[in-house]
Amino acid sequence: MALLDIVTYPAPILGKPCKLIEDIDEDLVCLVEDMTETLYDAPGLGLAAVQVGVDKAMLVYDVAEDENSESTGLKVLINPKIVHTEGKVTSENEGCLSVPEFRADVPRFACVTVEGVDHEGKPVKIDAEGLLAIVLQHEIDHLEGKLFIDRISSLKRSMYKRRVAKALKAEG
């Protein structure tokens, strides 16, 4: 296993939809292991393959069901898609490993149903609410070429983009 570099905004790959995975092979299993190590090292709740520079529709996540419960353990979703949404909620103080040092309130669905396959190719259907629903929406957004800053007000988004541009210019 190896720690992978996390790609950060404004890297172009983060703005492009990911390719669907057709075969689960040894390389993909290695990628899952490396992404897992990277997720826990970061630390984060979820990590999409695109966030480590890999153009594949896959994500890993580990979310406790609520504040009082332990981790549910690592889960892998390949080619996930949201097939049902319900209700509205604001994800307060949402952040992202690919958008460092910035947090914002983000409009999300309160409940989602997600379908995909696991790392063994078995079909998976997840009915999620609360934090899990937010994490799944956030990570699936990555696979569709969207960042959470694409879902906030244009004023807040432009302030962040200016700050990043200024920092990049200062780095030379």
UniProtKB/Swiss-Prot annotation:
Residues at which Fe cation binds: 96, 138, 142
Any one GO BP annotation for this protein: translation
Active site: 139
EC number, UniProt record: 3.5.1.88
Cofactor binding note from Swiss-Prot or TrEMBL: Binds 1 Fe(2+) ion.
Reactions this protein catalyses: N-terminal N-formyl-L-methionyl-[peptide] + H2O = N-terminal L-methionyl-[peptide] + formate
Record's keyword terms, sorted: Hydrolase, Iron, Metal-binding, Protein biosynthesis
Family to which this protein belongs: Belongs to the polypeptide deformylase family.
Domain of life, source organism: Bacteria
Function: Removes the formyl group from the N-terminal Met of newly synthesized proteins. Requires at least a dipeptide for an efficient rate of reaction. N-terminal L-methionine is a prerequisite for activity but the enzyme has broad specificity at other positions.
Protein's name in the database: Peptide deformylase
An example Gene Ontology molecular-function term: metal ion binding
Alphabetical list of Gene3D superfamilies matching this protein: Peptide deformylase
Broad class of enzyme this protein falls into: hydrolase
Gene name linked to the record: def
